[in-house]
Design a protein with these regions (language model features):
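Interfacial "cap-and-anchor" motif at the non-cytosolic start of specific transmembrane alpha-helices
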Residues: 2, 6, 16, 47-51, ...
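Intrinsic-disorder/low-complexity, polar/charged segments
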Residues: 4, 29, 53, 57-59, ...
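Membrane-interface helix-boundary motifs at transmembrane edges
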Residues: 22-35, 85-96, 162-175
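Membrane-interface elements of multi-pass transporters and channels
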Residues: 54-58, 87-91, 117, 124, ...
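The cytoplasmic-loop to transmembrane-helix boundary for the fourth helix
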Residues: 85-141, 173-183
């Protein structure tokens, strides 16, 4: 399983970088610029997952990888909403992004100071999971706020897609379906992971890449 996880992470990084090159070589539209940011922050997230996978001998080492992951997730959530708004012609007001930025600031301060307070993680310990070690955490109030934010973003996108679909052109409808399908897969992964279906394995890299 360790080598499968390694291969998935590396494949995801290479795929994202190749898509980034394709977009940058064009004259980017607003939707493409949003995708570039989405792509960059997804790569940052996957690098964090890889760091956690390779260096988790101590809580401090594993936490370094987690910090990189949350930097990626913070930018990913804002870029995802912007990309969905531009690509599927959803109308997302500007103040939503301001709220996102404020939440992400609190989250990043929380995770970068997680060793010194219980607000992001209540507890952290290293577990041996066969061929690799991993960190096991218990989420605190800021951690819960982050995932409420993530759920709110995914739900908002799905609702906006549903509202806009009937009044859209054929081309717009196709784009809306793409966004709704990709967003739905990501949401499903989070739900199944929360229910413990995947055990210690977290397929979030696959979901974000899709």
């Amino acid at each position: 399983m360790f080598y499968v996880l390694e291969a998935v992470n590396i494949a995801a990084i290479l795929l994202m970088l190749s898509m980034l090159v394709v977009v940058i070589r064009q004259q980017p539209s607003r939707a493409q610029m949003a995708f570039v940011l989405y792509d960059v922050f997804t790569v940052i997230f996957v690098i964090g997952v890889q760091l956690e996978l390779m260096h988790a001998d101590t809580v401090g080492e594993a936490l370094s990888g987690l910090c990189v992951q949350y930097v990626g997730q913070a930018g990913f959530l804002m870029a995802l909403l912007w990309f969905a708004s531009e690509f599927a012609y959803l109308k997302i007001p500007g103040w939503i992004y301001i709220i996102q930025a404020a939440i992400n600031t609190v989250v990043l301060v929380g995770v970068f100071t997680a060793e010194h307070n219980p607000y992001f993680y209540n507890s952290m310990k290293i577990l041996n999971d066969g061929m690799y070690q991993r960190i096991n955490v218990s989420g605190g109030i800021i951690w819960k706020m982050h995932y409420i934010h993530m759920a709110a973003v995914l739900l908002t996108i799905q609702i906006c897609c549903g509202v806009r679909y009937r009044q859209s052109t054929a081309t717009q409808k196709k784009r809306i379906l793409y966004i709704a399908a990709g967003n739905g897969i990501f949401a499903l992964e989070l739900i199944l992971k929360g229910l413990g279906v995947f055990g210690s394995y977290n397929p979030v890299v696959c979901a974000m890449t899709i």
